[in-house]
Amino acid sequence: MSERQSKYFDYQGIVISSTGQDNQDSETDLVYLIQAHGKAAPKNIMYGVSKCAFVPTNLERNFDNIEEAKNLERRSKIPLKFGEVILWNESDCDHDKRIILHIKREKPIYEASSSRNGLILKVGGVIQPTSTTSFWTPLCTVTMPETEATRAEPDVWLYAWIRFETTMKSGLDPFNMTATFESFDSCDPSDQARVCEAPWNAGSPDSKFGVWRPDPKPADSDDEIDIEPREGWHLPEDKWAEVIKMQLGLYVGERLLICKELSQFDFIIPLQKPFSRGTDKTLIYPAVGEYFHFSAIWSMQHNGFLIYELQPVPLLRQHVTSVNGNLLTRVVPASIRGLFVDKEGTLGLIDDPHHLLSFFEFHPAGYEFLKAMAEVRAVRTSENKSVRYRIVRTSGMSIFENWLRDTQFVVGPVKGIRINEDTVICAKHPNVYFKIPNNLKEGIPIGGGVQFVGKRQAGVDSEIMITECSPCPAFTCKNYSVSGDTRLFQVYLKPNCDHEQLAESDSMGFVDFRELETPCRGKFLAWVRESITVNDCRRAATIMEVCSTAICPPLIAMSANSSRATSARTTPAGSSIGSRSSIQSRASAATSVSSNRFVGPSSRRTPSGTPQSSTSSRV
């Protein structure tokens, strides 16, 4: 090879197998092509290595010392091993015969080992988000068993053991190679930038093909202005840091920890592994409801943190869980009306999307002293930013349920706003629907403010019938019809200093900001709508959600999942006398997190709902 060629090589390959016995007179090993001319090589190409590749060239010209020449000759004759990477140039191979004539050994790239099934390689790769049993690697894509797929997070650079097998005897044979997933090995936080090598992340800002958008900064430090914000403006505290160390988190299943102090972030276990506990050193998996100290690093792909250190905290009592893997806790009304907190104050805000406790505040025991046993489900920040728990079922509340079945009571006078044909909501009772009869609608248009008195009928779960009402111009707001019953309302909101997900309206109470950023000021105008229904319950933490802070009405795509499309606006059961048992059975059917700590997480299904269990892929 020339001096120029020794610095750059056209091809890179990895040794997969020895050649067949009939071909060993001319070839020694089979090499799978993985890179050509600095780019990913075309798939399904295998070369044989000629015996002459182990004979050094130009010994006399390069060495005057005979001992050095002998050492070079001896090193050149060392046989290739499974998993070893070699380099060669265009002039060093015969493409027609699929044979390599001269090689350059590369430093070790892949760790090789063996299992009871054969030789295996430790290869880095990424689980595909849209197909959670597909593991992409720079060498090939393999299919994992579901039991392994549930242990790992998609879009994280993980190391796994993969078995490569071929029935080829020489480079001229028809291509045949099978890659089989064996098991996961580890996750290294320092390698997470390699996630952008996956084809679906080519446009990521972290990718070498992406460009960071620069932040505008003054050219001179003298140009900086240091003044206090105006009175009444709220500047949210920025708790973000690239690395979080030794925080306390609650494991809620599906490789997710929630930290009460940093509830706006997800803390994800990228690769779930068992750990030993107790004197018998039995290996167990984390259980739902356990507390851990953890350290984590920021991940742009997940818009959250990946945990790289996890230590159990045995001194803190574990939460009780249901058979569905949800947390069982006693809840009490929170200071934010319509929401709840657990009695011990360890979880943070809890919402009630199924309206199971909408009449909780009217019980004679009093708003501040009544407690309910509830089954709550944790959600990721993509569903709720800071209200991280949702009530899916209540139990052990026979006294409250008997009271609901037999009791009538009167509410009002209170002020609210009419949001559709037959529904009024108010800030004082934000999780209750008030139904306005046809004979009282005159003079109160949709979007109009109303002062009313309502009467609750026995057996009705989450609505109260209005018996008296009159217009309230102070609460009337501008509204805009998108299509059918879908309407947008422009109201003034105030941000909540403690919970950036929530803002408060005088006429509607607290509303959910979803993924929008809360403006840093006192009062501001925003367009709100009734929350969309997902899985038979509202997606937002409150009845109303913000869709824009622009002055003009936003363009909203109509969805079949809107609340008006899926239910009559009465109770969650779709009937003004809906059964609480039917509501709770649907609520408990929501996706829950569960795991067996001795055998690992439960099976995960693909987005199509079809389980996948095949473990090998033909490349």
Swiss-Prot record:
The keyword Nucleotide-binding does not apply. Keywords: Cytoplasm, RNA-mediated gene silencing. Residues 563-619 are annotated as: Disordered. It holds the Pfam family OB_DEPS-1_1st. InterPro entries: OB_DEPS-1_1st, OB_DEPS-1_2nd, OB_DEPS-1_6th. Residues 563-592, 600-619 have a biased composition (Low complexity). Transmembrane segments: none annotated. It is found in: Cytoplasmic granule; Cytoplasm, Perinuclear region. Interacts (via N-terminus) with prg-1; the interaction is direct. May interact with edg-1. This is P-granule-associated protein deps-1. The gene is deps-1.
